Amino acid sequence: MAWEVFAIYHKDQPLWRGLLNQIELDRNNMDLWIRRPCVNDPKTDDYVREHLTRFVRLHRDFRPLFYNIADELGQGDQIRPNDFCHSTHCTSKFAEYLRKMYGTPANVGREWFVTEETRWDDESLKNGSHWATSNLMVNRTTTDQAFDTVAVAAFEAKCGGIAGLNKAWGTNFPAPHSGAGGREQWEPLRALLSETRSLPELTEKTLSERLGPIEKANARWGTHTTWAAEQRPTEFKSWSEVVAFLNRFYHELSQVRSTEGWNVSPWCDFRNFMDETFADAIGRARAVCKAEDPHARCATEGGQAPFAFGWYNYENVVKHVDVIEPYNIGNNVEVIRSLNPDVIMISTHGFQHKPGAPLTEEDRLYQKRAPQPIWWGLFHGHRGSIIWDDNLPEYRFVDEETRQLTPAASTFADTFLELHKGIAKLIINSRRLHDGIAIQYSQPSMQVHWLLDNLQHAREWMLHSGGDRGSHFTGVRNGWTKLIEDLGLQYEFVGARQIEQGKLTRNEFRALILPQSLAVSSREVEQIRQFVHTGGILIADYRAATMNEHGRDLGRGQLDDLFGITHSKGQPSGSGVSGMENYLSLHLQGRKLDLMIGDEGLRATTGKALAQSGQIPLIVVNDFGQGKAVFLNVELASYPYQRLTRNSPTSLPEIMEQVFGLAGIQPQARVLDEAGKRLAGAEAVRFANGAYEHVAIFCNPQFDDGGWGDLPTQAERGWAGPIDNSRLEKQAQITVAWPAGMATYDIRGRRDLGIIDKIQMTLDPWSPVVLTRAPKPIPVLRVEAPIEAQPGNPLLVTLRNESPLPEGAFRIVRLEFVKPDSKPYELYARNVRVESTPHLERLHLAYNDPQGRWQINAHDLITGRVARTEFTLR
């Protein structure tokens, strides 16, 4: 409805590309980073209010399923990096944001490492003087300045200061007097970087033409000193020396892998503000719709991966939408269903086929694959599907000339028909279960990781970065989710704010995972400590809580004492990884392990090093209160690829199975292959229905390439992703095993399997096995109807249990009607939720319904049983 406000830079690509071309040549002009339209401009609110009010009034009488505010939206072009928005409206709002967070300008200065912050930006704008408006806080928040800050931290750690750089590189930047220092000493270097970054190519010619004589440039750069250093020229002898210096500088910056000494809090604070203020604008649009239509559900479509840009901090997003259509990217589906299960998720599906062309074997393979994401979505929180037809010849479901269904329609027909007949309603109305595993969702960590990922693009970050495929943090998060799922377990993401508010201490979780969570607040740390002290298991990989939530390095890990570790300079590694000790459920002594080292500078202190490579510990366990902390000095980002590779030697699954054993976490339904081993790539999801439990078992492919980086892919076709999932595309003979025998029913196969603790079945690579488990056999359902009924009158159908269902349990019953000519009558078919009986279902018969004997079939989804009755229409 309002793409021209919320998705303008994606839908209008010439506008976006033109903006980037301008910015590339004028990097320090913040007027170019004024978003048009600005979401905080009152005129934008007026437009949205008028436009959406008119739109909703036009459609509300038709009771639409939802109102789509915008598709594929974002501050810039979806998640592509940007420095929006530097309008006066956003600058004033940013001042309000900082005032609420920090209280005083001096507190901002202390956090940002900036001296003499004395007034807020909204006050400076009101002042209007050149001095006031040229020294705005918001001017310190740009991505270029963040990369400069990272560079200064890296070179300070390496050289000690500007004097050390001069000595090591043979340069002659003005250096502070002996005993003086600080970050300000690097200002001459930052001045050089600032002047040269607007040149697309670093050549003697372009530098000379743009910046003038080298002598004048030296003089300009040399004036950027503090009281501690003498102002003097920088003494580059020629532009060729500057080119060589910059090439070396950016090469060494691209090699940085540590966040030691970083303080990117101005940038992180502004990114958080923009995510929040954009989400607030969506919230205002939603409020306009609901004011006109109290029944309105408001949506955004084309949801991207959780990311440092766009507005895709899902802790904000899920507060401002009722419905979302997320592209299944970067685990966003898992994040959404975890952070707010009340948000309705839907997915979009289609099949590409040239009209009139015969189906090839490849086409038929893609037809088999196409419905798989629909089943997957059902078990991961989706509640509906959009069919991508758009009347495009290669996607349309109905041939306009022949009025026949196309191969695109037949691809999905059987799946949609089965879902329509009740199984979807059963799963949607049941409660998804997890195994007590929480994964932290950390937007600040995501932001810092984006900087780490893109140091190689520091000069051209807006042009050569921005995709989720290159996001290492996305790869780590995906590695954790796939690893847990492969073990037959489930999890929930827990947001940083939820942790601060005490969610970990409500006895819902037994283990917490920090997936390279670099940036963690002190309030989170306090809650995490309490969680472990009272018996929880904390698990982290090799980057954990070394920064605060603003992106400022603290010089130590806030949880290092809890893990029993410390950090030092690199230590020698061995030729492999060996298990050194056993510890409770961890049986590692004498084992050769296939693991990738994370941090070569890690050392164990009070923690026990259970596995090492040379002097480097890889698995460290430490007792803390009643709980334990496990530090995995291991890289997980490549696990999603390893799991799809035949005969992969990775030890991660067996290690994590034993780590979860410390918390008593074991799969409640084990899926085994013919050899009795865990079936590779299978996922099991359980749903609670009162005392009953529904279990879905299915092959778990990799649908997207988020975090895939340089790992191998294959050619992409249409809706199919570029990942090779062929290892999981074979029919498997499986055994499903449970800890105890219970009454078990095959929902899709409509079979009563009896009281069992294991069952052998065939698992199709494209569709699931779905079972019901019950403490005792489920009561039989009866269906009753009057002996006779009359056309035009109501018909009352009674559903009755032979004995009551357990408290909180329900059935989904598919009522279907068969006419006297033995043909089904879809008009009266429906899915009925039955909680207690007798349940009366009323339907109105038409005057022109055929007279004779009708049959009613009541299919009980949870058991597969079908009850029947008849009535005569006369």
Question: What is each of the regions a protein language model found here?
Answer:
Residues 776-778, 860-868:
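Short acidic/polar inter-strand loop motif in beta-rich domains
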Residues 793-803, 813-817:
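Beta-strand-rich structural segments
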Residues 782-783, 865-874:
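Edge beta-strands of extracellular beta-sandwich domains
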Residues 33-46, 50-318, 323, 335, ...:
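Polysaccharide-binding and catalytic clefts of secreted carbohydrate-active enzymes
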Residues 366-370, 386, 504, 515-784:
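A conserved amphipathic helix/loop scaffold
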Residues 833-843:
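Aromatic sugar-binding surface patches on proteins
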Residues 768-773, 851-862:
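Short, aromatic- and glycine-rich surface loops/edge beta-strands on solvent-exposed regions
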Residues 26-33, 58, 68, 77, ...:
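Hydrophobic targeting/anchoring helices
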